[in-house]
């Protein structure tokens, strides 16, 4: 296979994994509802937790993390094979491109008319595969802010802002830092409605029935 074919297949696999609508499928199976018509309208773990329950919310979170993790692990395995024609010098940039495709796919799944989640859990999975210390430190920021504020959206956006600093601290890699700026900005952009509610003082805290 040519380099273009390999890269195209990796991009397709990453998109297909990232776009699996975990929360939507669970809500349909367990409650017979379209999760996008309830709560915040997101298919992500937080909305599933509020609308469907803690168990489904946790399952959604874990599967969504696994989607991001799996996309990078598959790409890393393929790129590391002797039969792969992709130049070794492209390795880092290909992984970062695959990572962003997985993040994008979670938010923009073709199966649901491009309406998905906010890519936080899938982004965490991607980070775990790219650089585990960065992932854990960023998740730590999320947990600290969540413990203080009990607002998931604020915690997610704060973690996204902290991400480039952690990537630089652990990797000193400008491509990784650049990726984190773009991916973090995308996650924050996906939280536009949450930002409006935060400014209005109406964003629900963890445990509320709506969000």
Curated annotation (Swiss-Prot):
Keyword field = Cell inner membrane, Cell membrane, Lipid biosynthesis, Lipid metabolism, Membrane, Phospholipid biosynthesis, Phospholipid metabolism, Transferase, Transmembrane, Transmembrane helix
EC annotation from Swiss-Prot or TrEMBL: 2.3.1.275
Q: Name one GO biological process term.
A: phospholipid biosynthetic process
Q: Which cell locations does it reside in?
A: Cell inner membrane
Look up the domain of life of the source.
Bacteria
Q: Topology in the membrane?
A: Multi-pass membrane protein
Q: What class of enzyme is it?
A: transferase
* Recorded catalytic activity of this chain's protein: an acyl phosphate + sn-glycerol 3-phosphate = a 1-acyl-sn-glycero-3-phosphate + phosphate
Tell me the disulfide pairings in this chain: none
- Which pathway is this protein assigned to? Lipid metabolism; phospholipid metabolism
Family as reported in the entry's similarity comment: Belongs to the PlsY family.
Q: Quaternary structure per UniProt?
A: Probably interacts with PlsX.
Q: What is this protein called?
A: Glycerol-3-phosphate acyltransferase
């Amino acid at each position: 296979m040519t380099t273009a074919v390999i890269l195209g297949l990796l991009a397709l696999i990453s998109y297909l994994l990232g776009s699996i609508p975990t929360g939507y499928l669970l809500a349909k199976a367990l409650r017979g509802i379209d999760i996008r018509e309830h709560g915040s309208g997101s298919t992500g773990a937080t909305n599933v937790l509020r609308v469907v329950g803690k168990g489904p919310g946790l399952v959604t979170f874990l599967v969504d993390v696994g989607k991001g993790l799996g996309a990078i692990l598959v790409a890393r395995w393929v790129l590391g094979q002797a039969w792969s024609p992709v130049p070794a010098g492209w390795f880092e940039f290909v992984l970062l491109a695959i990572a962003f495709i997985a993040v994008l796919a979670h938010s923009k799944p073709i199966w649901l008319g491009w309406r998905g989640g906010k890519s936080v859990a899938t982004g965490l999975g991607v980070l775990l595969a790219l650089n585990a210390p960065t992932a854990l430190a960023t998740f730590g920021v999320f947990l600290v802010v969540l413990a203080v504020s009990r607002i998931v959206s604020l915690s997610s956006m704060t973690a996204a802002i902290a991400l480039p600093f952690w990537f630089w601290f652990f990797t000193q890699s400008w491509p990784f830092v650049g990726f984190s700026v773009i991916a973090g900005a995308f996650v924050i952009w996906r939280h536009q409605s949450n930002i409006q509610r935060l400014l209005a003082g109406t964003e629900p805290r963890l445990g509320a029935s709506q969000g």
